[in-house]
């Protein structure tokens, strides 16, 4: 059995008995029912995922950041050149990027992995290699990768999770680095939903109107050339996806198989979540949406996943920065259900 098939076979629904027990506990606490909103949803969802009536704080918090390049940047869809990808990797490894700062604040570890940066393999202390190939091919003229490479990218993400996250309970957040990666993400969303490319394509790194129109045309051309099958996640990933998108989909599937909650970041991790959901619909039960990105397609992604974002921060950086902000929110939800007094304990009359 392949690693992907084995992982998919292990994914189960969260424990509904534990969910119901957690909901009863939340309703008995000294507050009007439901008054802590999404914080309560997080608490009972965690109970089901951890398969305990009272969810526990994570013993390990890890932000897994995957880096990969995209052949479609040859079409001029990004404001930044491709060499920024390896330059930013070195910034991550030196602790100077946005994700490093926010993960430090949250007490989380950052793991940076090269899954498909263009050019020769990068040799840098602290960089994990799970390379599938040297960047994807240009999906405007043909498939981004082969179906076998798509499977390898997903399995690389599963393996990375297994190697880097050992403690339980754990909390994992995903992030990425890859110049041009909003282009395949928009293509993936269009492939799965059939929505007009114009409505779901944004400015990415901040391109002007002229380049935005060009980006839309490139995505349309890629969808026409490749004709990805919306009912086959591997087909969509291989034809118009990215290696880091496949890797993040693998991390999500691995978390679902291991009973680990996984925090999504923005638009690119949302594309990975759609691929994961296509391969294993139950995997969405393990996903938490950290924030709503300003990329126009992100709201559509979250609707398709059935997830509500915790935050609206007008962010569009990627790297896992929005996901890192969710760490203390999730831990707060755990503390609320465990530490807040019930009406009976506090001697407070119920409404």
From Swiss-Prot:
InterPro entries: Nict_dMeBzImd_PRibTrfase, Nict_dMeBzImd_PRibTrfase_bact, Nict_dMeBzImd_PRibTrfase_N, Nict_dMeBzImd_PRibTrfase_sf. One of its GO terms (molecular function) is nicotinate-nucleotide-dimethylbenzimidazole phosphoribosyltransferase activity. The active site is at residue 319. Pathway: Nucleoside biosynthesis; alpha-ribazole biosynthesis; alpha-ribazole from 5,6-dimethylbenzimidazole: step 1/2. It is an enzyme of class 2 (transferase). One of its GO terms (biological process) is cobalamin biosynthetic process. HAMAP family: CobT (MF_00230). Belongs to the CobT family. Catalyzes the synthesis of alpha-ribazole-5'-phosphate from nicotinate mononucleotide (NAMN) and 5,6-dimethylbenzimidazole (DMB). This is Nicotinate-nucleotide--dimethylbenzimidazole phosphoribosyltransferase. It comes from Desulforamulus reducens (strain ATCC BAA-1160 / DSM 100696 / MI-1). The gene is cobT.
